[in-house]
Amino acid sequence: ANQFSPPTLTKTWFHQGMVGDEGEVQDEAERVSQYWSGDPPLLEQESPIKESLDRLEQPAKRDALRALRGSVLRTELFALDGSERETRPYTVTESRYELWEFDEPGEGDGERPRIFYPHVTATRTTQWERGNDPMTQFALTRYTNQAGEFDAFGRPLVQTTIACPRGWRATTDRPVEAYLSTSSKT
């Protein structure tokens, strides 16, 4: 028996780093307009990064944005099978990042670039399976302890996964069923 699997289309949006000479970041609204309209973004991607960048001088801002360049912001997976559901994705995933600077340059370091560590603090995965009743999960990750210090190896200290109940679509929804959550500490 012949087995056939239709081709798939994966759309992936990456952080562009610095666009332009003045340290501008790609406009989030421009990026969001390209997303599948049935699944608006639920994770604020720009605010945590913007807060980090606002404290930096231009050369350091360039180094921070260089560290973020190429980070995956969102992925959508479709099947190109010619059916009426071809425009509905199987899965939508989005991620939110924060920046951590370590080993700031000292007085004897001259003009060396600053070193930033971009890390994922939240991920949302919605499994549409081309239907109308998606399953949504969030994964929240904390890398710092109460004193704001990172693990010596950059490992997450706390990871929490939340599965949203059926019928849940937005953060303002109040579903009848309970959320399911697991948390682990290292």
Where are these regions (language model features)?
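Non-catalytic interaction/targeting regions
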Residues: 1-186
